[in-house]
Amino acid sequence: MSSVKLFKDLLGNTETVELKNKKLFISDKKINHQEIFNSVLVEEANSRQSTASTLTKAEVRGGGRKPYKQKHTGRARQGSIRNPHYVGGGRAFGPSPEKNYTLKQNSKAYKLAFQSAMTLKLNEQGLNLLVNKIDMKEPSTKTISKMLKKVSYENKKVLFVINDKNENFLKSCKNIQKVTSKMWNQVSVRDILNSDIAVIQEDAFDKISEVFA
């Protein structure tokens, strides 16, 4: 399946075209679900903020003196009322804001994951193209909404990938639920998988193919 829907304008006029640039796609046998999983895991881990924090027994206020003498009380020996087993005591092995959740994935593995995700999107007929020339003199949410409604995409998660930083187009997509717009060099495997439909500008598609093929 190498034919895709091409948006000829922002009015929702489309035609079916044959993909000329196919070097980004791989055979079904080479699709690697494990690398797709790894790339999403890495992206989510790297976006995680280390904000959870607790106090250890050294940081909790109070408990400097020994609660009672060492011997001859019939009780277990204690050194501080701020030990972890006391109410109000410090936390043993608690979360720290210094913890680093960063993960890495080598570029070759990420390329395979990206190719696999794009191939899956093409196979499920979720890949569309958009002409390079976008005439938007001002932001217009209504224009994008009408376009999506005309092709029955209004209830689907749509990802627009554009070639140049067209502020009017990016702002037009912001207020529409389930619609995301990104520059070609910002799109990730997670973005592709998280969308039902990916609409990519022709030049953006060529640039993505150069980088990830």
UniProtKB/Swiss-Prot annotation:
Pfam families: Ribosomal_L4 (PF00573). One of its GO terms (molecular function) is rRNA binding. Gene3D superfamilies: 3.40.1370.10. It comes from the Bacteria. The keyword Ribosomal protein applies. GO terms for biological process: translation. Keywords: Ribonucleoprotein, Ribosomal protein, RNA-binding, rRNA-binding. GO terms for cellular component: ribonucleoprotein complex; ribosome. Residues 51-90 are annotated as: Disordered. Residues 63-75 have a biased composition (Basic residues). InterPro entries: Ribosomal_uL4 (IPR002136), Ribosomal_uL4-like (IPR013005), Ribosomal_uL4_dom_sf (IPR023574). NCBIfam families: rplD_bact (TIGR03953). One of the primary rRNA binding proteins, this protein initially binds near the 5'-end of the 23S rRNA. It is important during the early stages of 50S assembly. It makes multiple contacts with different domains of the 23S rRNA in the assembled 50S subunit and ribosome. Forms part of the polypeptide exit tunnel. Part of the 50S ribosomal subunit. Belongs to the universal ribosomal protein uL4 family. This is Large ribosomal subunit protein uL4. It comes from Malacoplasma penetrans (strain HF-2).
